[in-house]
């Protein structure tokens, strides 16, 4: 959530910066509400001053033995007007707050300006896509050969956009997640967490999924009790661990990681990636979250992105890094890098990780703060998150990049310790 002071003092500048994201801020509505708020606030303050003066006059009139009934009536009238003014102020503020909850974050000055993914800027590449000397198969066909991927069985259970994994392919999927967690905890300094897969609405509001993106979520309604939502990412549960907290400077940076299933309705993805595991309603992901001092968040973003890249490097999977443009960034991001891995059957790079600096956007929603030792006062932290990595898409990349002419799959060297002696999946 943006600082409301920005809307009061720099409304047009904020509107211009949001326009670069393709977001049209209703300036007239905000100006109208702000004018009403100021007018009611001024009138309320005047009434309070008049009421205080009348109350003082009552004491003086009493001492003189004068009739205080007219003064008492005046005070009662003012009290009623004050109550009405407070109710109106609360209603105006609630409307302003509801607007604030739908406004995306302001892009950093270093973010390339653009309207869509076509305007993203490639920052670097790593590795060279393999030149196969046989006709390559996609991961669905490879999964059929090994009987390791079964989409028909999943459809019987749950419908479209689900998968059943079995045998060595299921083990490879588990190996990938274990490898990622071990790398991030052992070499990158993250603390592993196991968190709930269901959260309530305030947690999703804290990280920005609610109220704007409810249609993308799976909701569990319970009569007489608060609703649950299945997490779309462990970013929600990990980041909200600091909601309402005031952290000591020595606790920062916090580096948290979790391996969880993620659940998304893919409401806006009708007809896209309907084959295979690229876009699923349920998928596993290893998520990294950092909570840092504001002055260090851009540096932390580079480190977070490097942590995600290291997974791909050790798996020897070719990838590229993109700086997302203003029009393609996520709702809460100040700046985002996407990692895209090479998928041979599609002859292109596909997103496998998104690493974002959210500045104080989420922290303001959650009231997550740290005590600045220089001022002694609580201030908002900055939060970052990134996939390290999406496990299902990494499995797709491994199956396709490590395929052999007969449809078998070589196990990447770094995964062999997790595979119980299996070196080739047939």
UniProtKB/Swiss-Prot annotation:
Binding positions (L-serine): 233-235, 287, 387
Report the Gene3D superfamilies cross-referenced here: Bira Bifunctional Protein, Domain 2, Serine-tRNA synthetase, tRNA binding domain
Q: Which GO terms describe its cellular component?
A: cytoplasm
One matching Pfam family is Seryl_tRNA_N
Q: How does it assemble?
A: Homodimer. The tRNA molecule binds across the dimer.
Protein species of origin: Pseudomonas putida (strain ATCC 700007 / DSM 6899 / JCM 31910 / BCRC 17059 / LMG 24140 / F1)
Pathway assigned to this chain's UniProt record = Aminoacyl-tRNA biosynthesis; selenocysteinyl-tRNA(Sec) biosynthesis; L-seryl-tRNA(Sec) from L-serine and tRNA(Sec): step 1/1
Q: Does Transferase show up as a keyword for this record?
A: no
Q: Which Gene Ontology terms cover its molecular function?
A: ATP binding; serine-tRNA ligase activity
Q: Which UniProt keywords apply?
A: Aminoacyl-tRNA synthetase, ATP-binding, Cytoplasm, Ligase, Nucleotide-binding, Protein biosynthesis
Q: Is the keyword ATP-binding in the record?
A: yes
What is one GO biological process annotated to this record? selenocysteine biosynthetic process
PROSITE patterns, alphabetically? Answer: AA_TRNA_LIGASE_II
**Location(s) in or outside the cell:** Cytoplasm
Q: Which first-to-last residue range defines the signal peptide?
A: none
This protein is called: Serine--tRNA ligase
């Amino acid at each position: 959530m943006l600082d409301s002071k920005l809307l009061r003092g720099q409304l047009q500048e904020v509107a211009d910066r949001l326009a670069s994201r393709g977001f049209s801020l209703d300036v007239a509505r905000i100006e109208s509400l702000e004018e009403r708020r100021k007018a009611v606030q001024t009138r309320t303050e005047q009434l309070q001053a008049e009421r205080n003066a009348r109350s003082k006059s009552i004491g003086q009139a009493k001492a003189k033995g004068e009739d205080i009934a007219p003064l008492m009536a005046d005070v009662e009238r003012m009290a009623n007007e004050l109550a009405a003014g407070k109710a109106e102020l609360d209603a105006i503020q609630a409307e302003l707050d509801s607007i604030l909850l739908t406004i995306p974050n302001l892009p950093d000055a270093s973010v390339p300006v653009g309207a869509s993914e076509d305007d993203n800027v490639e920052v670097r590449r790593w590795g060279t896509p393999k030149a196969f000397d046989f006709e390559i198969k996609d991961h669905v066909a490879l999964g059929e050969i090994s009987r390791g991927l079964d989409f028909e069985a999943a459809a019987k259970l749950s419908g479209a956009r689900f998968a059943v994994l079995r045998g060595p392919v299921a083990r490879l999927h588990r190996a990938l997640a274990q490898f990622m967690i071990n790398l991030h905890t052992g070499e990158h300094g993250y603390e592993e967490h196991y968190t709930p897969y269901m959260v309530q609405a305030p947690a999703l509001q804290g990280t920005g999924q609610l109220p704007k993106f409810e249609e993308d979520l799976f909701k569990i309604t319970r009569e007489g009790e608060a609703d649950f939502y299945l997490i779309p990412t462990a970013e929600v549960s990990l980041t909200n661990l600091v909601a309402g907290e005031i952290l000591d400077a020595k606790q920062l940076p916090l580096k948290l990681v979790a391996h969880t299933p993620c659940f998304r309705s893919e409401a806006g993805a009708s007809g896209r990636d309907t084959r295979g595991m690229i876009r699923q309603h349920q998928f596993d992901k290893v998520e990294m979250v950092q909570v840092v001092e504001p002055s260090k968040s851009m540096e932390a973003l580079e480190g977070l992105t490097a942590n995600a890249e290291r997974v791909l490097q050790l798996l020897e999977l070719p990838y590229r890094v993109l700086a997302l443009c203003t029009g393609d960034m996520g709702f809460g991001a100040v700046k985002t890098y996407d990692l895209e891995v090479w998928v041979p059957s599609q002859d292109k790079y596909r997103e496998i990780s998104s690493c974002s600096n959210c500045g104080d956007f989420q922290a303001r929603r959650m009231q997550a703060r740290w005590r600045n030792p220089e001022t002694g006062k609580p201030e908002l932290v900055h939060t970052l998150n990134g996939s390290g990595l999406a496990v299902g898409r990494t499995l797709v990349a491994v199956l396709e990049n490590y395929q052999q002419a007969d449809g078998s799959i070589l196990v990447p060297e770094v995964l062999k310790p997790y595979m119980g002696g299996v070196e080739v999946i047939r």
